[in-house]
Amino acid sequence: LTYHLTSSNFNGKLNATKTAASSDGNTGGNTFNGVTTITNASAGYFGFGFSLPDTWNGDVTFTNSGSDRILPAWNVPGNLFNGNITLNSTGSSAGIHFCGGATATATLAATKSINTGTYDKGYLILQRFTQLGSAAVNLNLATGSNYLTLGPLTTFGGNFTTVAPSINN
């Protein structure tokens, strides 16, 4: 299954699983109002916010079990996460990479947190990611994962705890 999500509103629960081998870089401009689950189970990347910022108003879980990456808030400034973020990277995953474009930014709302569930494969990169408020952040990358990279321009407002095979900044 291939996805092309552009300037759409999702008012209920969304569960999107990518299985096609092609890479999907979604334009963006989407508003996700309900609980959202994004899964990449393919050999291509699954990206968001390539030309327009996305707004995630509910909790979101990103799970990568395919051999490429999930790319949230990839290329433009102004991506908003107004719910909690949970990250999973398993199977043959290359990892999850936030804000890869030179001007991309993501902001996590006050009282919300970004945490890991099962993260035993691939890397986690958080660039130009800002957490408002003081909610605790726990990122646990188990043995078998590659590394955690923070920055440039990444800010956490709360207590930050991480365990990872390698930590870069």
Please provide the spans of the model-predicted regions.
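Extracellular beta-strand-rich, repetitive "passenger/adhesive" scaffolds
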Residues: 1-31, 35-55, 61-80, 86-169
